[in-house]
């Protein structure tokens, strides 16, 4: 699996791995790269079955497989220890990594994640699946911003959204791959295992997230033994895209604090 690695800003700089959500594209983190690369070696990638890592995914494709293939790619690149920043599905992969490779994951940042899918989130995905079956890739892509962004943010950026729709349609991961990745997301359940995660965790959520209620992050916070929760008042599901200044400040402070906390505990 292909990874994109930034040059380390100094010798032995900590590694931060960015894992996007259901869309799977490493470009999702574009507005975080410049600030992170000043302090960390940053790894981003297109998830298997998407972008520059094309593949046909098995029907039983799982979050555990997503975690294993990423860890194997990191080890092959010479990376043994890394912090994880995961958004939604990416946060699930991050938790799986922390469970399966505890000696490797130093810190976990969960952005609009959850322990198990909430009934509201499941309903949103059911609607989106119906759109996919009835209207194909174009209907899925055109509806996606409604679940990602605040209404006023979208209204002020109509030309940008039209360009993003065209790009997303051109690079659509394919109906079968999308549904198999979505099914992996829906099957994931960390409610009985989260208390085994021992690395420090920062939980970031947005109070106006239409797709994932903030209660999901509260449940995560209660279940994770070494976690802190930060709530952004604005930004929607893709809060790192819509309000990068606020998000980046939380992310940078969280990474620095938790990495220091971990080193002090060793």
UniProtKB/Swiss-Prot annotation:
Annotated GO MF terms: hydrolase activity, acting on carbon-nitrogen (but not peptide) bonds, in linear amides
Described function: Involved in pyrimidine catabolism. May facilitate the hydrolysis of carbamate, a reaction that can also occur spontaneously.
Catalytic activity: carbamate + 2 H(+) = NH4(+) + CO2
Keywords annotated in UniProt: Hydrolase
Enzyme Commission number: 3.5.1.-
Induction (UniProt): Up-regulated by the nitrogen regulatory protein C (NtrC also called GlnG) and repressed by RutR.
Signal sequence extent: none
Family, as annotated: Belongs to the AB hydrolase superfamily. Hydrolase RutD family.
Highest taxon listed in the record's lineage: Bacteria
Source organism: Escherichia coli O103:H2 (strain 12009 / EHEC)
Enzyme class: hydrolase
HAMAP family with a match to the protein in the record: RutD
Name recorded for this polypeptide: Putative carbamate hydrolase RutD
GO biological process: nitrogen utilization; uracil catabolic process
InterPro entries: AB_hydrolase_1, AB_hydrolase_fold, AB_hydrolase_sf, Pyrimidine_utilisation_RutD
UniProt key word Hydrolase: yes
